[in-house]
Amino acid sequence: MRNCKMARVASVLGLVMLSVALLILSLISYVSLKKENIFTTPKYASPGAPRMYMFHAGFRSQFALKFLDPSFVPITNSLTQELQEKPSKWKFNRTAFLHQRQEILQHVDVIKNFSLTKNSVRIGQLMHYDYSSHKYVFSISNNFRSLLPDVSPIMNKHYNICAVVGNSGILTGSQCGQEIDKSDFVFRCNFAPTEAFQRDVGRKTNLTTFNPSILEKYYNNLLTIQDRNNFFLSLKKLDGAILWIPAFFFHTSATVTRTLVDFFVEHRGQLKVQLAWPGNIMQHVNRYWKNKHLSPKRLSTGILMYTLASAICEEIHLYGFWPFGFDPNTREDLPYHYYDKKGTKFTTKWQESHQLPAEFQLLYRMHGEGLTKLTLSHCA
């Protein structure tokens, strides 16, 4: 008798725990629908769909699995419809864009701060770092100064339509390559590869950023002849493009920067790449975006490139800006980068420094206002 009672109690407790778990999950989905999200007010085809839609769409994201923050996750039927219609409906608001450009230029002299020049620094001058303690310094050497341009590489440059290409996995299968290559000027981020992905990301590169840490991660700090050859061949493919090297963000880049300087001096005249070495630009850029209620530890490279593009481009189109682990068009899982190996899980390491969902929310709003065209759907 006693065993039967205990079994019944255990059964009841199990049902209670299951009910509580289901209630919590239901509340999560319900609250997410009530909260103002980053897109639009959702519309669903049938009663009861919102809750299940949240589970199937939201929980596909590794971001959601880890943080259970539904405000960033729901991909609704209305957004799917919007993605299909917006490319043809989007209209450039030139007046609003020019106003934004003026606002940016009030905070950032983009042309001047785009790169240090031979005339802007002297040998022995101590440079500080944007994101490191003021005690850390980098001394300008003769070799470093010799690599600086005589004038800003974007002085007196103007382009009609520019593409700023992020590295999000949303570009996988997008077939946006031809559209990107039709742009007058193409910005790329972090030396991202294009050769094996041309159908989706294009091949044209007019500028790519190069965080010094890339040398450690992909080229073994140039420690072997093979490493040096690989790096040389990668640079050769740029063929006249600007290599924008933010050497003064972190003091941890100092040693790698010196390795880079030695390499470029050694191969002087053998590469057509244009070198650009920005100084302490971020204090100015951060000030502008802070006024737009965006103040993470660090802005993403993508939004930094948008800032630079605003000074020389008459219209800016964005590709590969999507910080979530699922495709809004197909509901399929996505890698973090389009060039990640197949099966690579979506990473959330960026969360330590960046506010990518908040950046995306702002860019999406700018898209709606006609300031920039944000491509989230497939191009063909």
Curated annotation (Swiss-Prot):
Q: In which tissues is it expressed?
A: Expressed in fetal and adult brain and fetal liver.
Topological domain, Cytoplasmic: which ranges? 1-9
Q: Ranges in the Lumenal compartment?
A: 34-380
Catalytic activity, per the record? [N-acetyl-alpha-D-neuraminosyl-(2->8)](n) + CMP-N-acetyl-beta-neuraminate = [N-acetyl-alpha-D-neuraminosyl-(2->8)](n+1) + CMP + H(+); alpha-Neu5Ac-(2->3)-beta-D-Gal-(1->4)-6S-D-GlcNAc + CMP-N-acetyl-beta-neuraminate = alpha-Neu5Ac-(2->8)-alpha-Neu5Ac-(2->3)-beta-D-Gal-(1->4)-6S-D-GlcNAc + CMP + H(+); a ganglioside GM3 (d18:1(4E)) + CMP-N-acetyl-beta-neuraminate = a ganglioside GD3 (d18:1(4E)) + CMP + H(+); a ganglioside GM3 + CMP-N-acetyl-beta-neuraminate = a ganglioside GD3 + CMP + H(+)
**Which residues span the membrane?**
10-33
Post-translationally, this protein is described as follows, namely: Autopolysialylated.
Q: Name one GO cellular component term.
A: Golgi membrane
Q: Where in the cell is it found?
A: Golgi apparatus membrane
Q: Which Cys-Cys disulphide bridges does the record give?
A: C162-C313, C176-C379
Query: What is one Pfam family matched by this protein?
Result: Glyco_transf_29
The observed outcome of changing H337A is: Loss of alpha-N-acetylneuraminate alpha-2,8-sialyltransferase activity
Q: Which residues bind CMP-N-acetyl-beta-neuraminate?
A: N167, N190, S300, T301, G302, W322, Y336, H337
Keyword check for ATP-binding: no
Keywords tagged on the record: Disulfide bond, Glycoprotein, Glycosyltransferase, Golgi apparatus, Membrane, Signal-anchor, Transferase, Transmembrane, Transmembrane helix
Pathway per the UniProt entry? Protein modification; protein glycosylation
Spell out where the chain is glycosylated.
N93, N113, N160, N206
Q: Which residues form the active site?
A: H354 (proton donor/acceptor)
Question: Which Gene Ontology molecular function entries are recorded, alphabetically?
Answer: alpha-N-acetylneuraminate alpha-2,8-sialyltransferase activity; identical protein binding; sialic acid binding
Which EC number(s) does the record attach to this protein? 2.4.3.-, 2.4.3.8
Among the record's GO biological process terms, what is one?
A: glycoprotein metabolic process
**Keyword Isomerase belongs to the record:** no
Subunit composition?
Homodimer.
In the record, the note on similarity to other proteins reads:
Belongs to the glycosyltransferase 29 family.
Q: What does this protein do?
A: Catalyzes the transfer of sialic acid from a CMP-linked sialic acid donor onto a terminal alpha-2,3-, alpha-2,6-, or alpha-2,8-linked sialic acid of an acceptor, such as N-linked oligosaccharides of glycoproteins and glycolipids through alpha-2,8-linkages. Forms oligosialic and polysialic acid on various sialylated N-acetyllactosamine oligosaccharides of glycoproteins, including FETUB N-glycans, a2-HS-glycoprotein (AHSG) and alpha 2,3-sialylated glycosphingolipids, such as alpha 2,3-sialylparagloboside and ganglioside GM3 and to a lesser extent NCAM1 N-glycans.
PANTHER family in the record? ALPHA-2,8-SIALYLTRANSFERASE, SIA-ALPHA-2,3-GAL-BETA-1,4-GLCNAC-R:ALPHA 2,8-SIALYLTRANSFERASE
Q: What is this protein called?
A: Alpha-N-acetylneuraminate alpha-2,8-sialyltransferase ST8SIA3
Gene that encodes the chain: ST8SIA3
